[in-house]
Amino acid sequence: MGISLIGVEGMPLVGAGDDIAYLIISALNEGGEDLLDGDIIVIAETIVSKAEGNIISLEEIKPSPEALDIAERTGKDPSLVEAILGESSEIIRVGHDFIVSETRHGFVCANAGIDESNVDDGLATPLPRDPDGSAEKILRTLQEATGRELAVIISDTQGRPFREGAVGVAVGVAGLSPIWDRKGERDLYGRSLETTRVAVADELAAAASLVMGQADEGVPAVIIRGYPWGHLRSDGGVKPLLRPRELDVFRG
């Protein structure tokens, strides 16, 4: 099995009201590329939030007493801390230069997923309000425009407990199941797999992030071609990736 990662280059800076699907198709056409059946399009969450007008002006935020307290403990901008509080359902850990929280979507990550990169000074982008809904809307437009069978993943870059560095993860999914449950299959020695569940959407998002980059690469969307996901067709969204609170061994 061979998989290709194709960066969608030539996309303009995204602004409020832009149609992400249209921008992707236009950039592909300019580059002489077409979408094919089975392609998976991975899109950076930042441009989705920008297109949806989901932008935070830090200068307009008045920090609360809680934000001021956390800012003093972390060394972070009080306005940014207030924005993090607004996007969080729970603050889990704070320390010097870090805040780990659970977002309103159920993701546990740093800074509630708020990103200050690739936007103008004084602005920040939170995660899309409904990442699965955003992915579904983009998927529907792409499929109607091309007639192809596709899937869409909206990705974010997040850190992981006990490991350095950040990797791409899925925060929104449309068209495929984010989990491949392989329980009951046989390994190379004939033993039955008991617990193996593969986080396919996260693995695909991580692969795409190698092409997207984290700085000035200017590649906010990547086509993954050649991955056989026909057995994973689903409309269930990203929720299967989220570990239930009662099974969270880190928070108890």
Swiss-Prot record:
Instruction: Output the GO biological process annotations, alphabetical, semicolon-separated.
Output: F420-0 metabolic process
Which UniProt key words apply to this protein?
Answer: GTP-binding, Ligase, Magnesium, Manganese, Metal-binding, Nucleotide-binding, Potassium
Q: Where does a divalent metal cation 1 bind?
A: 115, 156
Q: Which cofactors does this gene product need?
A: Mg(2+); Mn(2+); K(+)
Which pathway does UniProt place it in?
A: Cofactor biosynthesis; coenzyme F420 biosynthesis
Q: Which GO terms describe its molecular function?
A: coenzyme F420-0:L-glutamate ligase activity; coenzyme F420-1:gamma-L-glutamate ligase activity; GTP binding; metal ion binding
Asked if the record carries the keyword Ribonucleoprotein, the reply is no
As its record notes, the protein acts as a catalyst of: oxidized coenzyme F420-0 + GTP + L-glutamate = oxidized coenzyme F420-1 + GDP + phosphate + H(+); oxidized coenzyme F420-1 + GTP + L-glutamate = oxidized coenzyme F420-2 + GDP + phosphate + H(+)
Cross-referenced InterPro entries, in alphabetical order?
F420-0_g-glutamyl_ligase, F420-0_gamma-glut_ligase-dom, F420_ligase_CofE_arc
EC no.? 6.3.2.31, 6.3.2.34
Q: Which domain of life is it from?
A: Archaea
Give the quaternary structure.
Homodimer.
Q: Supply the name of the protein.
A: Coenzyme F420:L-glutamate ligase
Name of the gene: cofE
